[in-house]
UniProtKB/Swiss-Prot annotation:
The gene is ausI. This is Cytochrome P450 monooxygenase ausI. It comes from Aspergillus calidoustus. It is a single-pass membrane protein. It comes from the Eukaryota. The chain crosses the membrane at residues 8-28.
Length: 517
């Protein structure tokens, strides 16, 4: 592939090598000054001979959970670590309330920093004021207001996707769960993104390309990434996939415009919502649509795979959930009210998110972790101005900081916290004052699965609807159990991310449903 890219021979010239060295030194000095101003301890410094910080960063990737635990054991409130994106601050959950709505601590710049949004080809992750505002408003306002109208179409589309993607035989059949779920979700939700039949496969391909490129680039020192991005095979594949996506989305926009002109009806899709949310400002509709699609795609697939792997080992929970689905559907049909009354299912999803939250992005897993300690990070921000918190902690402009989510594993808050209890939040909802806070879509300082405060995930209500509709269909139509000899864990862990084991195999068989959804 290198013959198609920039000639790399000049990299061997002495002046280029010298420039790289000088750039590296200046970068390290600059990044170091921002956290040393507070005399904050650096947890994983590998010393002066770790010139490009490869040893420190690899330790973070390999042992992030244990490092974070060690950090809070030794330095209760805040400490610094070298990560894939430079030196970051890690703060205790006590800071969550100060972070929740602080105007100078932003989410989008954090995402851009985590996933190379400043580089060509990574526009999906780039923070841009107009697109960021439209992204939030279209999800928080237009999508939320349309959710009731979307329930029935989503139920129909997801049901069809399951019929198309899942086995149709009544005998047991082994499937690679992650692959089937990805294609089910991409097809079942495609109508709000794109009508083109090529969209579901494109979404899967694009998610893989973005994840592979991001992971490959993260293996290089930060100061060299702009250079190596020009010739890394994974990045070149991402560029090609992005070009194909632009062509596909342009074709779909023309089709939707013609369809609306012929029917006179405003369709329920993001292109229409972007127009409303833009208030006349120019914006990149293609990038916005892709950003929203991939932001939801990863989270939806991750949650659904995690819950299905749990259900494959718990037939009693499957029976209880089926009884709830039958009772609720007979009373309410497909509606927002029905989804609200699926309280045990709601609890099961919230408990999966408590035990194994997604955290950050789509890193490619390289280490398999089967045990869980009590520390992880759940909320990330970048300071867009210098920020001074109540205790005097100074966060310099451009500095990224993460809030630990380890209260989700706190025995004082969640008894027997290491144990997965699908009924935990179902019981909590019955306690006085807990009906709202114990719901799947309710972020609190004790449960940061969807973030916290005014910048909590704005699409969580849509995500909850898609997940519940999907699981209703699957519970009614399929039995599930672990595949023979399948002994792998439910999750992969890499750096500060916990991802579903998408390679896990299960056995499924078609069953005769008690009710027709």
């Amino acid at each position: 592939m290198l013959h198609e890219t920039t000639n790399l021979a000049p990299l061997g010239q002495p002046w280029i090598a010298g420039l790289v060295v000088v750039s590296a030194v200046l970068y390290l000095l600059y990044s170091t000054q921002r956290w040393r101003a507070n005399n904050i301890p650096l947890l994983n410094d590998a010393g002066p001979f770790d010139f490009l910080q490869a040893t420190a960063v690899n330790r973070f990737r390999r042992d992030a959970r244990q490092l974070i635990k060690s950090g809070f054991d030794s330095h209760r409130d805040v400490f610094a670590m070298r990560t894939d994106v430079g030196v970051e601050l890690f703060a205790s959950p006590e800071y969550a309330d100060q972070f929740r709505n602080h105007p100078s601590l932003k989410v989008f710049p954090f995402t851009a920093k985590m996933h190379h949004g400043h580089l060509p080809g990574f526009e999906l992750c780039r923070s841009q004021p107009v697109e960021d505002r439209i992204f939030i408003e279209s999800v928080r306002v237009q999508l939320a207001q349309s959710l009731g109208k979307l329930i029935q179409p989503l139920a129909s589309d997801i049901g069809q996707a399951i019929s198309d993607r899942w086995p149709s035989e009544s005998g047991w059949e082994e499937i690679a769960l992650g692959s089937v779920v990805e294609r089910t979700i991409s097809q079942g939700t495609s109508s709000v993104y794109c009508l083109d039949k090529a969209w579901p496969e494109f979404v899967v391909k694009m998610e893989m390309a973005l994840g592979m490129a991001s992971a490959a680039l993260s293996a290089w020192p930060v100061m060299l990434r702009r250079i190596v991005a020009k010739f890394l095979p994974e990045c070149l594949e991402l560029y090609r996939t992005m070009d194909a996506g632009r062509e596909l989305m342009s074709r779909d926009m023309r089709r939707r415009t013609a369809l609306q002109a012929s029917t006179g009806e405003a369709p329920l899709n993001f292109f229409e919502w972007f127009k409303e949310a833009s208030h006349g400002e120019e914006h990149d509709e293609l990038i916005l649509n892709l950003r929203i699609a991939f932001a939801s795609m990863h989270g939806l697939c991750d949650h659904l795979v995690k819950i299905l792997l749990r259900l494959s080992e718990d037939p009693q929970l499957v029976d209880d959930l089926r009884k709830e689905v039958i009772q609720v559907y007979k009373t309410h049909g497909w509606s927002k009210t029905a989804l609200y009354h699926l309280k045990l299912m709601d609890s099961a999803f919230k408990e999966v998110q408590r035990v194994d939250p997604i955290l950050f992005g789509m890193p490619t897993p390289i280490s398999l972790v089967q045990t869980h300690s009590n520390y992880e990070t759940a909320v990330g921000r970048v300071a867009v101005d210098d920020v001074t918190l109540k205790d005097g902690l100074v966060i310099r402009k451009g500095q990224s900081i993460r809030i630990s989510g380890h209260t989700m594993w706190d025995e004082d808050k969640y008894p027997d916290a290491a144990h997965f209890d699908a009924y935990r939040f179902y019981k909590l909802r019955q306690a006085p004052g807990q009906e709202n806070t114990a719901q799947f879509t309710s972020p609190t300082s004790d449960h940061l699965g969807f973030g916290y405060g005014g910048r909590a995930c704005p699409g969580r209500f849509f995500a909850a609807a898609v997940l519940k509709i999907s699981l209703c269909h699957l519970l009614m139509k399929y039995d599930i159990k672990p595949a023979d000899g399948e002994t792998g864990p439910h999750v992969w862990e890499f750096a500060a991310a916990i991802n579903a084991n998408m390679a896990a195999k299960v056995l499924v068989r078609r069953r005769q449903p008690e009710i027709q959804l």
